Amino acid sequence: MIDEILFEAEEHMNTSVERTRDELVNIRTGRANPAMFNGVIADYYGVPTPITQMATISVPEARMLLIKPYEMSMMNEIENAIRNSDLGVNPTNDGQVLRVTIPQLTEERRRDMAKLAKSKGEDGKIAIRNVRRKGMDQLKKIQKDGDAGEDEVQAAEKELDKVTAKYVAQVDEVVAKKEAELMEV
């Protein structure tokens, strides 16, 4: 029973770290990254579809992306989806591929993005702490119901604290890496 609670808590904490990592990928750094288009949805014959499933996205240069649709008839749909996204980029269509040049970020914009990264990291840490609180409540309930002894529950609480600290440190590491990436000119 205690092992299940610890295992479940660790899984949820890992999910929180992954979600934070995914959210940070979407923050633009001034460098071309195909993952920035993961959340961009285009209309594919009436079905909302991620453009990553409609085209190949390559990085020929540090600040340029090439998007080659699998079907040329989808070129305009993909172009419009990118223009309408909140990425702040403007694709150019040469008939064969879409070229997306990533503009250089200003110092102020870099700081704003770093603040956003910190905020996303804080959200991730809050989610991890909420999982910890839920796990602690479950452990106390088990002890109260008499399903586990006080020593077992205390050991499990210490283990849960260790796991929490480990995942909070992972979030801090991911955020620090993203901030360094953002502040790099």
From Swiss-Prot:
The keyword Protein biosynthesis applies. Its main location: cytoplasm. GO terms for biological process: translational termination. Gene3D superfamilies: 3.30.1360.40, Ribosome-recycling factor (1.10.132.20). SUPFAM superfamilies: Ribosome recycling factor, RRF. It comes from Corynebacterium diphtheriae (strain ATCC 700971 / NCTC 13129 / Biotype gravis). It is found in: Cytoplasm. It comes from the Bacteria. Belongs to the RRF family. One of its GO terms (molecular function) is ribosomal large subunit binding. Keywords: Cytoplasm, Protein biosynthesis. GO terms for cellular component: cytoplasm. This is Ribosome-recycling factor. Responsible for the release of ribosomes from messenger RNA at the termination of protein biosynthesis. May increase the efficiency of translation by recycling ribosomes from one round of translation to another.
